[in-house]
Amino acid sequence: MPLLWLRGFLLASCWIIVRSSPTPGSEGPGAAPDCPSCALATLPKDVPNSQPEMVEAVKKHILNMLHLKKRPEVTQPVPKAALLNAIRKLHVGKVGENGYVEIEDDIGRRAEMNELMEQTSEIITFAESGTARKTLHFEISKEGSDLSVVERAEVWLFLKVPKANRTRTKVTIQLLQKQPQGGVDAGEEAEEMGLMEERNEVLISEKVVDARKSTWHIFPVSSSIQRLLDQGKSSLDVRIACEQCHETGASLVLLGKKKKKEEEGEGKKKDGGDGGAGADEDKEQSHRPFLMLQARQSEDHPHRRRRRGLECDGKVNICCKKQFFVSFKDIGWNDWIIAPSGYHANYCEGECPSHIAGTSGSSLSFHSTVINHYRMRGHSPFANLKSCCVPTKLRPMSMLYYDDGQNIIKKDIQNMIVEECGCS
């Protein structure tokens, strides 16, 4: 259902931006009544003749998006000095050197952040017991190994504290990563990372924690995971050290089911239970260590790259984005619209031949590609459908304007500006 809604919205937006709906019988010989958005391609190429119609369509579109029946009438403009002072106080924009108001594009930044978050994967990997005592093994999933840019990586460990009195309230917990022979090239780098030469280990995270209550503790390991991914590796092996835990009776829950029973006695005997001993195995399993990884593909990853929509330059006749800017000053709307100075009323036009319509990056969705596959092969009921040039990516727009009561309104409007076009 969301997909159908999106397709309908994009088609409607494109139609509103470009031209008003034709009256019956007004369609020219090149019109495509079975594909409303395809009518964009039939616009007159003589821009001066078609511009008034375009501008009127843009006006109607803006008023509709602002939920206004008509433009506000500004009878007594607010003095410019008072306006600029209010904008500064409200932090809704800034005044440029030329005196024009520049609205802060918070919504644009949020949209970029949301797009980035959509491209980020979050993976949780539970620890397995390593080959040696007090070591943990984290195997990063196949999906994680396909990602190459680490946004955040953390190891979560549970510190269990008995109710008995303790002589120490703070303990230091260290995460040490075993290095392969020859794994560290530069001596200075190794020294900075805390290389333990006798064990060939690197200190990758350290934290002083409160030993008065049982709780989870988080250890950042982003740089270590990034190095592993850069080296093409998909697993992390760490040794957990807590030299002061035995003084407080505190213990770190380190083990999964593997090797738990054979090590818990030894761990408790030697250092106060650092091996994660506990009477209730199910409860201890709920405190099993895990690695939380947030990562994404790099910009130049082959699966990340996609074909950008074409810009209309007069040399192509296939589906492309046509730039069209309407200045609010030129249309007499700068008396009530404070910012921005105009509207990028971009629209889509061009043909969608069969070899383009189903191409990755040019089609609106996977659904469109499947439909085109059947359409090209003449399968009913898709044989008579036509592929249309429509917006495939839109971005929001922020507006600062006066209402009829001389109030200053800031409104963020979603899906207002066409960024890319493709074949539906």
Swiss-Prot record:
Region of interest: Disordered: 257-288
Organism for this UniProt entry: Felis catus (Cat)
A GO term for molecular function: growth factor activity
Superkingdom assignment: Eukaryota
Propeptide: 21-308
Name of this chain's protein: Inhibin beta A chain
Protein keywords: Cleavage on pair of basic residues, Disulfide bond, Glycoprotein, Growth factor, Hormone, Secreted, Signal
Family assignment from sequence similarity: Belongs to the TGF-beta family.
Stretch forming the signal peptide: 1-20
Pfam families: TGF_beta (PF00019), TGFb_propeptide (PF00688)
